[in-house]
């Protein structure tokens, strides 16, 4: 058996990072961590605490309350997948709402939020054998990761994928244009923020999955993993 490694999968929102990271982790017996879910959980906390007034976040109150935000992952025995818990409550479905999607990028630009999340993520990866997806895993969280993937896809393809997810969860009101606008705005914020902006690591392999099926993506990732580990 080869020594365990760290696999960093970065890329734009709604490009299928989480799906491929979960599939890869399950196939190779690694732990999967959805870092985007961590930022979404902080966002959900801020919404529930009423920290948004007329679209503006009370950042100082959130800063002071960050020590009260406890995010953990627990394995769902039925699905075999990790689910997100906020202060002991399963919020896996709640963090996927459009309201959270609309506010998560501004939350993720806050230095004190990113610093707290990065510390947690680095602690999770100390023993390696982990697949972590996000925006800055290969550049900030684990710049020494042995395998780095940068995922992208056309905006309209990503919007349709996200809309399909929302429809499957019972959202019948959000439109394609709503989702596309949200994705384009998140791209802008993620790419221009001062702290850990979304960018491709110099040594990352690029995967444009605009026209790939999930099985094709999984096969591609497994091939790259075998190349890196020599397995």
Curated annotation (Swiss-Prot):
Gene transcribed to yield this protein: cmk
Protein name: Cytidylate kinase
One cellular component (GO) term of this entry: cytosol
SUPFAM superfamilies: P-loop containing nucleoside triphosphate hydrolases
Disulfide-bond pairs as recorded: none
Binding site for ATP: 11-19
Keywords, sorted A to Z: ATP-binding, Cytoplasm, Kinase, Nucleotide-binding, Transferase
Catalytic activity: CMP + ATP = CDP + ADP; dCMP + ATP = dCDP + ADP
